């Protein structure tokens, strides 16, 4: 029997409807949230992601600001754009689209962002608050992934969750979020260097695949009935974008998020929600 499709688009629209009302209420009080994006280079996938984010803003009523920079931009020029957004009151929050070209220092860029304007929840201060379980903007993809599991009634309390990937955007933060008391999962963090990965995944109730290795999770690595989140994106040998989960997994798993269309729509929804929540916080202050 085919697995249940964990369709993020269903619940993205639910979140957007709530955000539209909240943005309208802010505008009645003279406040219009603004989301900015900083995009470096000509990667088609990154351009597509950014375009969708600005389309989301238009739908919800959030102002959007685009900063598109050439692939050969210098660190100093990129720093100047970040400083400009930090000082711009029209920009409630912003993201720097990752990954950046290799000549740029990604960590230095993330550290330069004003932590209060960090819409992606990836500033070291905000990741540190996540470790300490203090309020801060949460990383959008892990937040979307957990929301998707909850909305489809996937049990997290006491569940054995295997996370594959150690990146700052998904792998590391989702492990922290899943071990909060509100989720209460037992997490094993694996990666491309893990020995006998299949032994880990076969024992998992939930698998979060975020390594960026095409079709690395196959049916023989999955416990029947397990829930699988396909978060990784990479290009196969044919040049096409692929997820980390092989299509044959759908015949074994109980639930699978498609890629695209699973976690991605909720990532975008929580990005905008982080910006709207900051606008509400500023108004209360």
UniProtKB/Swiss-Prot annotation:
It catalyses: (6R)-5,10-methylene-5,6,7,8-tetrahydrofolate + NADP(+) = (6R)-5,10-methenyltetrahydrofolate + NADPH; (6R)-5,10-methenyltetrahydrofolate + H2O = (6R)-10-formyltetrahydrofolate + H(+). The gene is folD. CDD domains: NAD_bind_m-THF_DH_Cyclohyd (cd01080). Catalyzes the oxidation of 5,10-methylenetetrahydrofolate to 5,10-methenyltetrahydrofolate and then the hydrolysis of 5,10-methenyltetrahydrofolate to 10-formyltetrahydrofolate. The lineage of its organism: Bacteria, Bacillati, Actinomycetota, Actinomycetes, Mycobacteriales. GO terms for molecular function: methenyltetrahydrofolate cyclohydrolase activity; methylenetetrahydrofolate dehydrogenase (NADP+) activity. NADP(+) binds at residues 165-167, 192, 233. Pathway: One-carbon metabolism; tetrahydrofolate interconversion. The keyword Transcription does not apply. It holds the Pfam family THF_DHG_CYH_C. The keyword Hydrolase applies. Its EC number is 1.5.1.5, 3.5.4.9. Homodimer. This is Bifunctional protein FolD. Belongs to the tetrahydrofolate dehydrogenase/cyclohydrolase family. It comes from Corynebacterium jeikeium (strain K411).
């Amino acid at each position: 029997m085919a697995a249940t499709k964990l369709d993020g688009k269903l619940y993205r629209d639910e979140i957007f409807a709530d955000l539209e009302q909240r943005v309208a209420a802010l505008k009645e009080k003279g406040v219009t949230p603004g989301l900015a994006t900083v995009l470096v280079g000509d990667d088609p996938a990154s351009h597509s992601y950014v375009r969708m984010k600005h389309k989301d803003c238009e739908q919800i009523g959030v102002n959007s600001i685009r900063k598109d920079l050439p692939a050969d931009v210098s660190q100093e020029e990129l720093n100047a754009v970040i400083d400009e957004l930090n000082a711009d009151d029209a920009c409630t929050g912003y993201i720097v689209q990752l990954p950046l070209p290799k000549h740029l220092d990604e960590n230095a860029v993330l550290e330069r962002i004003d932590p209060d304007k960090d819409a992606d929840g990836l500033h070291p201060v905000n990741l540190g608050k996540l470790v300490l379980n203090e309020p801060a903007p949460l990383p959008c993809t892990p937040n979307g992934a957990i929301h998707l599991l909850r909305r489809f009634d996937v049990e997290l309390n006491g569940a054995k969750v295997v996370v594959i990937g150690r990146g700052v955007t998904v792998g590391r933060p989702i492990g922290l979020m899943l071990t909060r008391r509100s989720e209460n999962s037992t997490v094993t963090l694996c990666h491309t260097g893990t020995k006998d990965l299949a032994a880990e995944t076969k024992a998992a109730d939930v698998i979060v695949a975020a390594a960026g290795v095409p079709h690395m999770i196959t049916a023989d690595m999955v416990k029947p009935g397990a829930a699988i989140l396909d978060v990784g994106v990479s290009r196969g040998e044919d040049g096409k974008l692929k997820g980390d989960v092989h299509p044959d997994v759908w015949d074994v798993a109980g639930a699978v998020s498609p890629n695209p269309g699973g976690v991605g729509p909720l990532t975008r929804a929580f990005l905008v929600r982080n910006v709207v929540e900051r606008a509400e916080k500023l108004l209360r202050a």
